[in-house]
Amino acid sequence: MSRDVKKVVLAYSGGLDTSVILKWLQTTYRCEVVTFTADLGQGEELEPARKKAELLGIKPENIFIEDVREEFVRDYVFPMFRANAVYEGQYLLGTSIARPLIAKKQIEIARKVGADAVSHGATGKGNDQVRFELGYYALEPEITVIAPWREWDLTSRTKLLEFAETHQIPIAKDKRGEAPFSVDANLLHSSSEGKVLEDPAEDAPEYVYQRTISPEAAPDVATVITIGFEKGDAVSINGEALSPATLLAKLNELGKANGIGRLDLVENRFVGMKSRGVYETPGGTILLAAHRGIESITLDRGAAHLKDELMPRYAELIYNGFWFSPEREMLQAAIDHSQAYVTGEVTVKLYKGNATVIGRKSPYSLYNQELVTFEEGAVAYDHRDAAGFIKLNALRLRTTAARARKAQ
């Protein structure tokens, strides 16, 4: 553990853990601390974080609070959704995709204020420590990283509270008892993990769900919306042009009201263990269905199938923290190229936990109704051509079968 750090930029939420980290950095490293708090759409007031940082001795000029919602959706969420990225077949990567942006902002601030270190509040068991630190090193190779949870001896809630009381860190009454589960949230999703959720055999209590109503409690009448796309990105809802963050927020409202986006899963962490989480991604679930809907009529079959083959690798890179890696950028270039004609409108029916595409249209549609119709007509497709096509594709199968017979 290096003690020659002069100034450190801390990813700061204003909560108990990062407030303890702030004071621990001051007392252990005896360095100047700069705080960065991001508004990612987590639904919390951020000014209390400023006041708490000031109370803990941070100079006003060393407190950075930034609304990054538009940048988050435009430059991180939307590029990821162009790929239809899903980790292990279920997880829409809501937590994973937020970490690179936070890391980027910390490095930008470090350069601005002349800091020689950055710090985060991720534990030594989870994925976030990897995501943050890979981002730091990719953007600033020589930066010093301080990960308090891997260094200190504050290994229990009791010790954290004792440290806070010793150093006069304000503790909200509801924080003195250990929370039944931990929550991480941003504009794309919220995740709940730990405590009451640790046994994967037990059903998650209803109070865990904070962003969606139960599908059973959703309206008995469907909500039908139309989402407009331009080059793979959603740009409008029901004909109203919206900014990326505003559009996602609107989809979140629609998804919440219809019980859409709940997910209870056990995933494989990058660090090697399995973890159980309850995720809510109402707007993202609708967006994914709609994007696949518009791609279904605008992407060539070969391009669509190749995208689906590449997607798991792309999703894994994001999950594991390699957003700034050459391979992710290479895949992104291919994915973005595929979206040149992914423009049009998709109609989606929202009903009791389901987002179902019921219509799609595009000026660049590859769907040819004349080719697929069962009615007679003068079209380029001749049924007789299928015979040769089938025979050629069956050639290797017939050859293999003949060999098997011969070997009997």
From Swiss-Prot:
InterPro entries assigned to the protein according to its UniProt record, in alphabetical order: Arginosuc_syn_C (IPR048268), Arginosuc_syn_N (IPR048267), Arginosuc_synth (IPR001518), Arginosuc_synth_CS (IPR018223), Arginosuc_synth_type_1_subfam (IPR023434), AS_cat/multimer_dom_body (IPR024074), Rossmann-like_a/b/a_fold (IPR014729)
Known EC number: 6.3.4.5
GO cellular component assignments: cytoplasm
Family assignment from sequence similarity: Belongs to the argininosuccinate synthase family. Type 1 subfamily.
Catalytic reactions on record: L-citrulline + L-aspartate + ATP = 2-(N(omega)-L-arginino)succinate + AMP + diphosphate + H(+)
Annotated metabolic or biological route of this protein: Amino-acid biosynthesis; L-arginine biosynthesis; L-arginine from L-ornithine and carbamoyl phosphate: step 2/3
Enzyme class name: ligase
Annotated L-citrulline binding sites: Y91, S96, N127, R131, S182, S191, E267, Y279
Gene this chain is encoded by: argG
Pfam families attached to this UniProt entry: Arginosuc_syn_C, Arginosuc_synth
Chain positions recorded as L-aspartate binding sites: T123, N127, D128
SUPFAM superfamilies: Adenine nucleotide alpha hydrolases-like, Argininosuccinate synthetase, C-terminal domain
Full protein name: Argininosuccinate synthase
Listed GO MF terms: argininosuccinate synthase activity; ATP binding
Main localization of the protein described in the UniProt heading: cytoplasm
Compartments (UniProt record): Cytoplasm
Assembly behavior: Homotetramer.
Biological process, per Gene Ontology: argininosuccinate metabolic process; L-arginine biosynthetic process; urea cycle
Residue numbers binding ATP: A11, Y12, S13, G14, G15, L16, D17, T18, S19, A38, G121
Keywords: Amino-acid biosynthesis, Arginine biosynthesis, ATP-binding, Cytoplasm, Ligase, Nucleotide-binding
